[in-house]
Amino acid sequence: MEGIMKKFFALMTLIAGISFSLDFACVDTNKVIRESKFIAKAQTELRKELEKYQKLIQEKQKKLEALKKSLESKALSEKAKEKKAKEIEQLEDELRKLQVEAQSKLSRKKAELEKMVFDKVIKIVESTAKKKKIKAVFDCNSMLYWDKKIDITNEVLKELDK
């Protein structure tokens, strides 16, 4: 009986040692995205860039519509109509190029901002984990249950928005 108790005690000690060495935490990434001022600023920057391109495209579209209406004028000579048709063709080409450029630049800008945000969040999570001697950090949203004591989201948010 004493041998069984020693084995049981040794097993419990081993299990207790394992559970203490598995220090982990979680970060609610949805909350970080939703509440971070840093991320909101990056999104605003992207939105401004989008609005700038939308304005340029709308201006070209209005100009194109005006040219098309003037082409319908019966007062224009054939030579003037040909000139207007070439202007329309040129403007349509410019508009297509602008749309492609806008899409490309916005995609690139979005990727740059996402990488910058991701890198900063990872750096903060790593720093926080090292300070607290945490061995692993998970996304709270992928866990079925967690004790709120292991949630370091607010610390990450505070550091991110400094």
From Swiss-Prot:
GO terms for molecular function: unfolded protein binding. Residues 32-118 form a coiled coil. One of its GO terms (biological process) is chaperone-mediated protein folding. Keywords: Coiled coil, Signal. Residues 1-21 form the signal peptide. Gene3D superfamilies: Skp domain. Belongs to the Skp family. This is Uncharacterized protein aq_157. It comes from Aquifex aeolicus (strain VF5).
